[in-house]
Regions:
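Secondary-structure boundary/capping motif
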Residues: 29, 49, 133, 161-165
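Aromatic/hydrophobic pocket-lining residues that form π-stacking "cages" and hydrophobic walls in ligand
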Residues: 3, 7, 112, 173
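Hydrophobic alpha-helical segments, chiefly the membrane-spanning helices
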Residues: 193-199
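PLP-dependent aminotransferase-like
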Residues: 75-76, 93-154, 164-168, 175, ...
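Conserved small/polar residues in nucleotide/adenosyl-binding loops
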Residues: 182-189
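N-terminal small-domain helix-loop-helix segment of the aminotransferase-like
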Residues: 1-83, 90
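Flexible low-complexity scaffold tracts in large eukaryotic assembly proteins
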Residues: 156-159
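Glycine/Thr-rich phosphate-binding loops of Rossmann-like dinucleotide-binding domains
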Residues: 28, 88, 112, 161-162, ...
């Protein structure tokens, strides 16, 4: 957050700054979103909602995935959170056991490693510099994986850099991960084996 505060100071002084802190867009909230918020307030939608999302919101998510991606889900498979950080924290708490590793490309949002540590895991930081447009390569991903790898963070568009992986780049990363098979007869007896990437 110190980076964000410093960027704001420099902007106030007239400097042209690209902030790599909070990851906020450089445009205002679109009017139709502002109006929807006003309508919701006028309709009295100002109380606590179900933790996992309202039925109407869950249905909108179901409809979106069906329409845009050809995927079918039920409301019991949808969990709405207040943002990406909460979702990542929830994932870590639910999936990480002691010393499980989480691969995190850097630059990353400041709290990602701490959320892994709070869950008892070990962050594995993969440096992705400006020379590679702040994107992790398949070779870097392969080198970061171990028998203890439980999660891989892939944030696109990236917060804080804004870098976006192309479809080809995502496929290449997916090929590295596709050869991994996790079996879990019990939560404490996990094994990982390699399978051909065509599997």
């Amino acid at each position: 957050m110190a980076v964000t505060a410093r960027a704001q100071e420099l902007r106030a002084a007239g400097e042209d700054v690209i902030g790599l802190g909070a990851g906020e867009p450089d445009f205002d909230t679109p009017d139709h979103i502002k109006e929807a918020a006003h309508v919701a307030i006028r309709q009295g939608q100002t109380k606590y909602t179900p933790v996992g999302g309202t039925p109407a919101l869950k249905q909108a998510v179901i409809d979106k995935f069906n329409r845009d991606n050809g995927l079918e889900y039920t409301a019991s498979q949808i969990l709405v959170s207040v943002g990406g950080k909460q979702s990542f924290y929830n994932l870590c708490q639910a999936l990480i056991d002691n010393d499980d590793e989480v691969v995190i490309p850097a630059p990353y949002w400041v709290s990602f490693p701490d959320m892994v540590l709070l869950a008892g895991g070990a962050p594995v930081i993969v440096r992705a510099g400006i020379d590679q447009n702040f994107k992790m390569t398949p070779q870097q991903l392969e080198g970061a994986l171990s028998k203890r790898t439980k999660l891989v963070v892939l944030n696109s568009p990236s917060n804080p850099t804004g870098s976006v992986y192309s479809a080809a780049e995502l496929r290449a990363l997916g090929e590295v991960l596709a050869c991994l098979l996790y079996t879990s007869p019990s939560p404490r007896d996990r094994t990982r084996s390699r399978m051909p990437s065509s599997a």
